[in-house]
């Protein structure tokens, strides 16, 4: 009997626990003001019930026939308790088979949850890839990256896409590259064989191609180096820079296996010395044209080009015919701080920007390096272009049917203005697009680009048209110092013809200009709707009397505009060199675009940057667009060192003009070694710590300043610093677009440590 009583007590306690648990679950629920009901009478009966019982009929539930959703007119939106009396009244109606008040349900995605982006990969340098994920060293830096991780989370990693790097070779057996190496995308045009392996030397001169390839396709989760932007893509290397470069070699490289290679990445070009004007030869130009017409089975090869590192030399990438080509996507750089680096060039042909190195103290780019090593010091626009190529590979995996012009439109329409808004020079063109001669249309946004490229919604852009505008009666116009030539160019943009243009893409101004000092010319073009673009800025170091011969100045700044109306060309020389003279001999305006507006452009561009929410700009230095008074050679030599008896206020007043204090002999010796490094033979012994400096302290002081801040000297054709840089960079006629001086400094620091 006692046993039976104990059993009953246990049973009662168990029921009590279950009842408490059920009520506890209900207590945690959030009931909403919605009731689902099954009503066999259909829509008419449901409407009648709603009117009689004080509900709003929200409609049928999905595809379920005779199932309807109601909202009560006098019930709160959410409640922790269910409204049993309302539910009972509804379910008691003879026309209702079943009724239930709705409540919130907790659901979680069945993906692997990571604590942070830092835990995504086991590659040791992944946490240093700040440009792919936010790993700010200080809170003052903006929270910015290229927004690649959300694309990876969709499973898009570059699979099936082939990229080749045109450079000085590829260490294809590198642990972090080998799994993604594609021999069919590789060739050695320097030695004329199928192996692009780089030539080793004591200075590791030929590391550039391997570094660029690593940025694109470093393998993920293999405990080596970092992670490539398109880490499941295939990558090849074209060895063509480690030897004599000819037009034929360039053409062969640019046009290598276009039926197999999707993207060509190039981080080199003519000398960025501020005085060279050069572009593709006849053969290379034909290779570009063939690539966009026949490459990728007629969809067009994607050519990605680094915009150039001649900023400190006052160079202008409109004088570089590779970045100035309508067939290339020209990519510039932004620093970790979201600012334009001191080496970056300004021009009207730059389409967009990705990240790279900035000031001496900023983080640089991580990649694979020679001898199966890794690096975190890849620099310059050399490092920016491969990141862009990797992003384009993600887009091609998402939509393999994109054409070469589709890719350019995607870049224009999704690149971000907001992350770089602190920089001067932004303007809105006639199509409502923000554009800047430093950054093109802004910072690449991988997620936005891939989302827009979705094959379910993307429509290929209309057929490309070309309209040539010229004045057959034009007579040569003379130009002198402090003078100007203004040419008004009315056009109907081939209206009524098969090649009529209503929506612009590229604009080319082809001209022959004879002038006694080419670098003093300034050329602007103003579109029919008023967008003014600098086609050529002055270049202090360009003293050539050769002018321009049928040179194409290209601009993307009027993208999306209607070209109909009067354009205005203005050529000036404000140098004050009264001996200057010349003339504009002939010209023509070449409009590229479409006869109808592309589908994605029928609604205005809305700038809703993902960075707007993430980026805390507090503490981020703002750039001010002012012209600083530049020191003359005389004043620089007279004020190099801060006197010991100078007052603190005087020192503070000169902070923008010079670094306080005398540079240490250790730093001067470091710079001396960097300048001398390329001149040393393989057998030359290292300089001893007590070696005498062969370059004056004053010149080092100037060089040290210009590592972080470019400037020119009034009253002299070239600065001493520029002379040293010319010597430093004179090893090859074609220049890698990394920062070799910074690389040399870093190498020496690493050796000493």
UniProtKB/Swiss-Prot annotation:
Family, similarity comment: Belongs to the peptidase S8 family. Furin subfamily.
Keyword Disulfide bond recorded: yes
Lineage: Eukaryota, Metazoa, Chordata, Craniata, Vertebrata
Organism whose genome encodes this protein: Mus musculus (Mouse)
Residues covered by the P/Homo B domain: 460-597
GO MF term (any one): identical protein binding
Localization (cell): Cytoplasmic vesicle, Secretory vesicle
UniProt keyword Hydrolase, yes or no: yes
Ranges of compositional bias, category Polar residues: 633-651
Propeptide: 28-110
Protein name: Neuroendocrine convertase 1
Active-site residues from the entry: 167 (charge relay system), 208 (charge relay system), 382 (charge relay system)
